[in-house]
């Protein structure tokens, strides 16, 4: 080859190298530009970037590795296709024709699409045929319906973030998070998990465990063969053939009222066992508690798992509503507290308040009996020379684990040196110990309970100064144990769970409230609660407890319900995907509930309507459960009916109360409001009680240019039932102090409400009014929801008197409600109206003046619980947050029009609180305060008697 040819070849090679280098640089710049400018409407993930890229020109492959933030977003098959398309369009030729592979979070982005949302599933992160065999840990045998497409047989562990812990370095008990916006995370997350998420999962058939105490009952009664709470009694009845004996394993005994660190009460006593029989009631053990105060108590049993233990130990819980039967699989979970359910018990020791364990079984073996616990109780673990001083449900998981018999390394890896980190680790390690030896955790030793996922619900820090939402964040961990869970399943199953929960929340919250809920990132990071569990796990940072815009929603009970239902649905769909099974979503609660007198003598007929869930096509009812309560007792186990109607025969002289749930193959809805009815023995007529009090709400909001927060003193709101969420009253309202967590920082709150259960709407006030009517005279009564009145399905003319409960609901007097009441009055009706917050509605179309015969005189402050006087008596209505009845911070001033007169007044008589109209055409009695909030039963009865006599007497007053 001549010199020129060699030179020319060299030039060509140099040009090719320069051209290749230019292509690489252009590709790199285009990739950097793409990721730097990348935004997604799916989530707020922050700035993305390019980590590196690889080009194989020979194979025509371009591999792109995005920064971690790019993996924080949710991936679907649709947005993955869009990313590839847009990225290719931005690349130079010929690279834009190469096979493109985009990596994030350690995988191709198409592999990050959750299995539930993709056509070709990743089997490495599915359980597939891996499943627990045999009976669940606990089964409610008395449940009157079957669940076949819910979470039946599934065992789920979840927890409500932090609790009070002993801080070793400070030598004091402290919350783990600051007091902000009237709460602290340690209290706040309880109000989502315990009243909403746990029951929804259980209603779907799941066995739910939480490593923190779930029962808000301060009292605790222990009944045991070794030691009993004073007044309680343990009894054994033996068969001629079989006798109770001590087990070789130790059992529970409560030797002390308070316990030091590293002391296990489940090794201080004995446990008892007896061989099983096929015939019922041959031999049994009884635990009869001496209940200190009437109320609801969680019931926990305990036993030891023995080589011959059976999986169907028969427990009977006798409570105020009857008897509920459970089957407990004693082949797992021995040596700890096992939750059966929460029931209502009367004060004292009663033969209808106890737990019985029978030796009846379908299996040959033994049943074991140890202590039974009633109620959550107070914290009893001593740290630094003192107990926490709060109910056990407010303490961290570390202390519950010790009381529950967990080994010391489970709840104190630090050997007592750092309770804070021990508490964080104890949540996961407790679940691992319980599940050790099960199909989902075969590599660890433990109690063989087949838990298959965990979820920790937290709230986060972070704030915005422009009333913008911070929103929800999810956390999971894949970089541990070679990327596998203890069952061998890929840890990316945890990402699937995280993605599905966040996707569900964004969809459900946005749809329910018409607000674009903020979805944040999915972090693949090294957190104890997602690293340590042997099963798929996630942390849900639901919202920011430091941000006012988030907490406006966080304090809203309807929001709490929506969050609970959304997370439940995501868990249902996740586990159904993991096992390849179909699912059905449990229905929504029914509405339009009404009780009418039946066609036959001494019967009542109940009617209601199902509620469609537009978000979930499978959530259709297939039947209903009607629960009954007689008098002051508890609700029974319910009766299944196929249609939305039920007729019940009653005994005159007794008050019957009912609540209804909807059921399908996926489970059971939350209950309806509670309605009541009564048939007098010699009835003079029938009255109708209308429940117009549906409302729940958060506390009063303050949001101006300078001030922001929640004013619990002005109005603590209306919790759903009751809530432990409030720590105290907000002290710092200065918007300029946002981000400061002490001193005068925005949201900083005091501690005066800590440990108190603030009362809200029980949805059971028809019973309160009804009992007053029952005592007032020989009148029968039935009841209905306000929806039935508004829809025209209830004919008011059938009733001698109508009692409308407005409670503290500002929306009671809708247009259709006003029309129905006006029509009733025009036909000679007798109407009682009581409540607060509704006064402004009187001015609409002169309804107050023309129908109720009163005018609105404004609101009267009741923050100091001022006296109300009238009808020869005086009483007070609770104005502030308290534990006995929902607060009424302001009451309505009502003034009579011509022809009517004042019957009640506030304080000195200058502010009218009740009016009476006794015309020739009809009669009304209007109260500017809720009658049910008159707490003294005798006074309330006297007031109702006065009202009934006034409205129904033949003489005109």
How should each PLM-predicted stretch be described?
Residues 647-667:
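Beta-strand-rich modules
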Residues 263, 270, 275, 354, ...:
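Active-site-adjacent mobile loop/cap segments within catalytic or ligand-binding domains
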Residues 196-204, 212, 384, 674-800, ...:
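Aromatic-Pro/Gly-enriched surface loop or interdomain linker
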Residues 795, 804-902, 907-908:
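A glycine-rich, often tryptophan-bearing local segment used as a flexible ligand/cofactor-contacting loop or short
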Residues 65-67, 72-174, 369-390, 394, ...:
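Non-catalytic propeptide/linker segments at domain boundaries
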Residues 394-491, 523-546:
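Active-site microenvironments of hydrolase-like enzyme catalytic domains
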Residues 574-618, 667-685:
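Pro/Thr/Ser/Gly-rich low-complexity, intrinsically disordered linker/stalk tracts
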Residues 532-545, 566, 776, 789, ...:
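A glycine-centered loop/beta-turn motif at secondary-structure junctions
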């Amino acid at each position: 080859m001549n010199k020129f040819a060699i030179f020319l070849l060299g030039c060509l090679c140099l040009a090719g190298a320069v051209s290749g280098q230019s292509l690489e640089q252009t590709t790199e710049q285009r990739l950097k530009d793409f990721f730097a400018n990348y935004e997604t409407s799916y989530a707020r993930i922050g700035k993305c970037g390019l980590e590196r890229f690889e080009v194989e020109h020979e194979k025509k492959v371009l591999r792109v590795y995005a920064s971690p933030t790019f993996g924080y977003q949710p991936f679907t098959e649709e947005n993955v296709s869009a990313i590839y398309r847009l990225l290719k369009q931005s690349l130079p030729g010929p690279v834009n024709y190469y096979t493109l592979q985009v990596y994030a979070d350690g995988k191709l982005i198409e592999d990050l699409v959750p299995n539930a949302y993709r056509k070709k599933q990743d089997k490495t992160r599915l359980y597939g045929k891996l499943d627990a065999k045999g009976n669940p840990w606990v089964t409610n045998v008395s449940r009157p319906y079957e669940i076949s497409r819910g979470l039946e047989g599934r065992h789920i562990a979840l927890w409500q973030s932090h609790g009070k812990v002993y801080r070793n370095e400070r030598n004091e008990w402290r919350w783990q998070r600051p007091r902000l916006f009237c709460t602290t995370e340690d209290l706040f997350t309880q109000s989502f998990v315990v009243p909403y998420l746990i029951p929804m999962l259980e209603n779907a058939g799941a066995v739910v465990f939480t490593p923190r105490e779930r029962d808000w009952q301060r009292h605790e009664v222990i009944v045991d063969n070794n030691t009993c709470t004073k007044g309680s009694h343990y009894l054994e009845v033996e068969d001629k053939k079989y006798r109770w004996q001590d087990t070789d394993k130790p059992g529970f005994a409560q030797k002390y009222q308070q316990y030091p660190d590293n002391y296990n009460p489940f090794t201080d006593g004995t446990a008892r066992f007896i061989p099983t029989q096929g015939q019922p009631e041959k031999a049994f053990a009884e635990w009869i508690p001496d209940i200190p105060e009437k109320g609801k108590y969680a019931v926990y049993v305990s036993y030891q798992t023995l080589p011959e233990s059976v999986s169907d130990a028969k427990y009977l819980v006798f409570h105020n509503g009857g008897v509920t039967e459970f089957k407990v699989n004693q082949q797992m979970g021995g040596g700890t507290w096992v939750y059966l359910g929460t029931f209502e018990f009367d004060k004292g020791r009663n033969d209808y308040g106890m737990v019985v364990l029978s030796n009846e079984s379908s299996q040959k073996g033994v049943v074991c009996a140890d202590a039974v616990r009633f109620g959550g109780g107070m914290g009893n673990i001593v740290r630094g020379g003192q107990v926490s001083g709060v109910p056990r449900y407010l303490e961290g998981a570390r202390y519950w684990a010790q009381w529950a018999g967990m080994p010391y390394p489970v709840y104190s890896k630090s050997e007592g040196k750092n309770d804070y980190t021990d508490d964080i680790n104890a949540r996961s390690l407790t679940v691992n110990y319980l599940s050790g030896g099960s199909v989902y955790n075969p590599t660890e030793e433990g109690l063989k309970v087949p838990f298959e996922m965990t979820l920790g619900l937290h709230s986060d820090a972070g704030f915005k100064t422009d009333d913008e939402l911070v929103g929800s964040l999810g956390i999971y961990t894949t970089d541990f144990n070679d990327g596998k869970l203890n069952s061998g399943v890929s840890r990316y199953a945890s990402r699937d769970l995280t993605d599905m929960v966040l996707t569900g929340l964004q969809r459900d919250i946005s749809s329910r409230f018409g607000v674009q809920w903020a979805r944040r990132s999915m972090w693949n990071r090294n957190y104890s609660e997602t690293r340590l569990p042997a099963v798929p796990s996630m942390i849900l940072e639901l919202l920011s407890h430091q941000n006012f815009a988030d907490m406006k929603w966080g304090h809203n009970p309807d929001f709490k319900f929506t969050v609970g239902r959304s997370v439940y649905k995501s868990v249902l769909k996740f586990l159904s995907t993991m096992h390849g099974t179909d699912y059905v979503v449990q229905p929504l609660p029914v509405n339009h509930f009404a009780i009418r007198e039946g066609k036959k003598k001494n019967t009542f007929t109940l009617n209601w309507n199902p509620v469609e869930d537009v978000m979930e096509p499978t959530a259709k009812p297939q039947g209903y459960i009607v629960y009954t309560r007689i008098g002051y007792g508890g609700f029974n186990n319910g009766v299944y009916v196929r249609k939305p109607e039920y007729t019940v025969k009653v005994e005159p002289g007794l008050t019957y109360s009912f609540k209804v749930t909807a059921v399908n193959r996926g489970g059971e809805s939350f209950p309806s409001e509670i309605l009541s009815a009564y048939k007098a023995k010699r009835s003079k007529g029938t009255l109708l009680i209308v429940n117009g009090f549906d409302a729940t709400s958060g506390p009063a909001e303050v949001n101006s240019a300078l001030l922001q927060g929640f004013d619990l003193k002005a109005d603590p709101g209306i919790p759903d039932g009751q809530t432990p969420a409030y720590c105290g009253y907000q002290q710092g309202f200065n918007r300029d102090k946002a981000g400061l967590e002490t001193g005068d920082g925005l949201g900083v709150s005091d501690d005066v409400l800590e440990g108190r259960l603030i009362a809200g709407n029980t949805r059971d006030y028809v019973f309160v009014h009804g009992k007053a009517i029952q005592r007032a005279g020989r009148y029968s009564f039935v009841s209905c929801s306000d929806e039935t009145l508004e829809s025209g399905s209830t004919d008011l003319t059938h009733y001698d008197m109508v009692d409308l409960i407005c409670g503290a609901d500002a929306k009671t007097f809708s247009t259709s409600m006003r029309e129905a009441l006006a029509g009733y009055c025009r036909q000679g009706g007798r109407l009682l109206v009581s409540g607060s917050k509704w006064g402004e509605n009187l001015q609409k179309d002169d309804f107050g003046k023309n129908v109720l015969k009163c005018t609105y005189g404004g609101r009267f402050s009741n923050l100091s619980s001022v006296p109300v006087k009238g009808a020869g008596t005086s009483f007070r209505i609770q104005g502030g947050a308290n534990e006995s009845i929902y607060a009424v911070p302001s009451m309505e001033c009502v003034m009579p029009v011509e022809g009517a007169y004042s019957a009640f007044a506030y304080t000195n008589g200058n502010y009218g609180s009740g009016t009476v109209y006794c015309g020739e055409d009809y009669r009304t009695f209007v109260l500017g305060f809720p009658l049910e909030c008159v707490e003294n039963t005798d006074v309330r009865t006297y007031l109702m008697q006065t009202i009934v006599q006034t409205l129904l007497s033949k003489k005109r007053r």
